[in-house]
Amino acid sequence: MNTLSSRRMVPLPCGPVGVREHGSGRPVVLLHGLVANGLVWRHVVGGLGDGFRCIAPDLALGSHSPALPGADLTLPGLARTVIDLLDALGIEQAVLVGNGYGGDIAQVVAAEYPQRVEALVLIATNAFDSDPWPVKLLARLASLPGAGLLQSAAIGLKPVQRLRITYGGATKRPIPADVMAEYLRPLRMDPLVRKDFRRFLGGLSPAYLARYSPRLADYQRPALVVWPREERYFPAEGASRLAQTLPQAALEFIDDSYAWAPEDNPAPLVALLRDFLGRLDRSS
């Protein structure tokens, strides 16, 4: 059963944001990567069960509802969106879990708003000055006239979906067709979403995390860094640097997965999260 099949829209200053929720208890906010949405966490949420209030927003990363004109779609702007979402849901503090570019956003949130982050989990993400070549290439291509429509059409082809520059670098296994359709529908069908995505890609810069990642040294709360051993986008040295920078971090590696562990091989990730969240319960 897909525990995240139901979505509601939450009005925020940046525009309406789709949110999927499941369970009750300690709030756990789950942030996805590029051209995905909250569905990427469906197996993780199912594995965690009903004892946590799992919240999976659809951030403006290419599989979202259009943002308002002028909305800040930089990493700091999307971090502010996470805080606005917590405010809208009446949540003072949450465990923050980020994968891929969701992990970039989570780092900015923890650095800028540490009092709102009860604990931090980073899964295969950028760190410090890393800047994956596939995303740099996508950003260059997206800046070309008419490229957004062409890219959105091409990504609908299964062979293109398995290229390393697309989902083939994020997951070892093909993503189920119904889930892939949900990921791609906004980008393929809505020119405003394509415009948002171009804005996000155009605003990416290693300078952001070069500024924010070192500030995680001041984050004095429990943290977990999880890295797939076969990860193909984000350098493994980023895992070590993050774990060394975060004062209370543990570093764990998982097998048989690329970057998107929640989609690719969620079972070992769920086990690590259950243990981590269980330790939070015992220490509170």
Language-model features: locations:
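Conserved serine/cysteine hydrolase catalytic core
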Residues: 192-241, 253
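Helix-rich cap/lid subdomain of alpha/beta-hydrolase
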Residues: 132-185
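Active-site loop/oxyanion-hole signature of alpha/beta-hydrolase fold enzymes
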Residues: 55-101, 271
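Conserved HGGG/HGGXW glycine-rich cap/lid loop of the alpha/beta-hydrolase fold
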Residues: 20-64
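Conserved hydrolase catalytic core segment
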Residues: 92-133
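Catalytic active-site module of serine/aspartate enzymes centered on a nucleophile-bearing elbow/loop
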Residues: 249-284
